[in-house]
Swiss-Prot record:
Entry keyword annotation includes Cell membrane: no
Protein name: Large ribosomal subunit protein uL1
Gene Ontology BP annotations: regulation of translation; translation
SUPFAM superfamilies, A to Z: Ribosomal protein L1
Length: 229
């Protein structure tokens, strides 16, 4: 713990908490101040001036990052018949029906993404209390309720991320790993920023993005100038 605190203090000394860094500066600083002993994740956070209690100001969706996430996702698909075979051929890790429901209700959660064909949602709905709080419930807005299961599996395996504004209007997203080249992290960051900018609700008032920051696992938040994106 003492060593971690020392590393954290050292990282804080390199960051000016009053400054808005350009995206290039922020990415370089995030990599430089990372002290985790593993290939840490790089995440961004957007504090949005929205009221998620209003249906027209809820922000949720999915996108495929141009350079992937550096993470291998374990994909579970609820499908039957030909669609189940398509999912398997596309590389899904787990494919099934009621058998998977029983397994998940028994406490098994060794997967990162859940995809379902529309006809399977009545079955998947029984898992709402388990999948919902973990943001794993299939949803048409994130492309995880679809008949094109092959495409959904391939995208999930190839760098697709989902995002959702929480009750405070904060959206967090993974944009890569510390081991990524800085230019690839910058490209992913800019791609996600474009999505966030386009997601601005028409009814949102005032400054839409009140703050944007980047951090690594166990790292320090670095404020980013939205205009540099």
């Amino acid at each position: 713990m003492a060593k971690k605190s020392k590393n954290l203090r050292a990282a804080l000394e390199k960051i000016d908490s009053t400054k808005l860094y350009s995206v290039e500066e922020a990415v370089a600083l995030a990599k430089k101040t990372n002290f985790a002993k593993f290939d840490a994740s790089v995440e961004v956070a957007y504090n949005l001036n929205i009221d998620v209690r209003k249906a027209d100001q809820q922000i949720r969706g999915a996108m495929v990052l141009p350079n992937g996430t550096g993470k291998t996702s374990r994909v579970l698909v609820f499908a039957r018949g030909a669609k189940a075979e398509e999912a398997k051929a596309a590389g899904a890790d787990f494919v099934g029906e009621d058998d998977l429901v029983a397994k998940i209700n028994g406490g098994w959660l060794d997967f990162d993404v859940v995809i379902a064909t529309p006809d399977m949602m009545a079955v998947v709905g029984r898992l709402g209390r388990v999948l919902g709080p973990r943001n794993l419930m299939p949803n048409p807005k994130t492309g995880t309720v679809t008949m094109d299961v092959a495409k959904a599996v391939e995208e999930s395996k190839g760098g697709k991320i989902t995002y959702r504004a929480d009750k405070a209007g904060i959206v967090q997203a993974l944009i890569g790993k510390v081991s990524f080249d800085a230019d690839k992290l910058v490209e992913n960051f800019k791609a996600f920023h474009d999505v966030m900018a386009k997601a601005k609700p028409a009814t949102a008032k005032g400054t839409y993005m009140t703050s944007v920051s980047i951090t690594t696992t166990q790292g320090v938040g670095i404020k980013v100038d939205p205009n540099s994106l």
